[in-house]
């Protein structure tokens, strides 16, 4: 898997953790298709906390090239308006990346597609008008469910590496 991270003012340890989470998530979610996939991760201002998309210049019939955008400024504040401390921010950053990697998996496995401009989940059109409908959409139910598992399993591996057990 080819990965590139575009980010400014991010320390080396966090950058390594992001590369690690990209690889860990791909290994868990789409191990047989990893070698053909390329992912560009951008940390920059964005209208959403995070978004995964098929790269525009490539076909969406058999997607292999992806772009993930995460807004590190937006995720620095929790749902109650509290500013996160550094370790909470890093944890949220990794969890958001895990969530977006689930969407990448959905694109790769053709579970999440776009037909005639409409988003489809397993060939059924899905759309939402409200925040409640967004959280009930099948692709989001899966992504929110798997993000925590990916984060916990990756953190356990990272802690073993840091302590010298691996």
Feature locations, PLM:
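Auxiliary, metal-adjacent structural segments of Zn-dependent hydrolase domains
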Residues: 2, 9-69
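A short small-residue
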Residues: 3, 76-83, 124-129
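Short alpha-helical scaffold segments that flank and stabilize functional sites
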Residues: 28-29, 105, 146, 150
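Short alpha-helix carrying the canonical HExxH Zn2+-binding catalytic motif
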Residues: 89-105
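Active-site scaffold of zinc-dependent metalloenzymes
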Residues: 49-91, 107-108
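Catalytic Zn2+-binding segment of zinc metalloproteases
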Residues: 100-117
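Metalloprotease/metallohydrolase-associated module, dominated by Zn2+-dependent proteases
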Residues: 115-166
């Amino acid at each position: 898997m080819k990965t590139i991270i575009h980010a400014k003012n991010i320390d080396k340890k966090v950058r390594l953790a992001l590369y690690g989470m990209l690889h860990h998530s791909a290994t868990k979610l789409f191990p047989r298709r990893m070698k053909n996939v390329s992912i560009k991760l951008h940390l920059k201002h964005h209208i959403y906390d995070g978004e995964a998309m098929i790269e525009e210049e490539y076909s969406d019939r058999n997607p292999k090239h992806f772009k993930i955008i995460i807004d590190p400024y937006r995720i620095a504040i929790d749902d109650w308006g509290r500013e996160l401390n550094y370790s909470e921010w890093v944890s949220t950053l990794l969890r958001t990346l895990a969530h977006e990697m689930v969407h990448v998996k959905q694109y790769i496995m053709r579970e999440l597609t776009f037909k005639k401009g409409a988003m489809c989940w397993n060939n059924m059109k899905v759309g939402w008008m409200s925040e409640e409908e967004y959280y009930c959409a099948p692709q989001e139910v899966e992504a929110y469910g798997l993000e925590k598992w990916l984060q916990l399993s990756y953190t356990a591996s990272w802690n073993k590496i840091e302590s010298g057990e691996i």
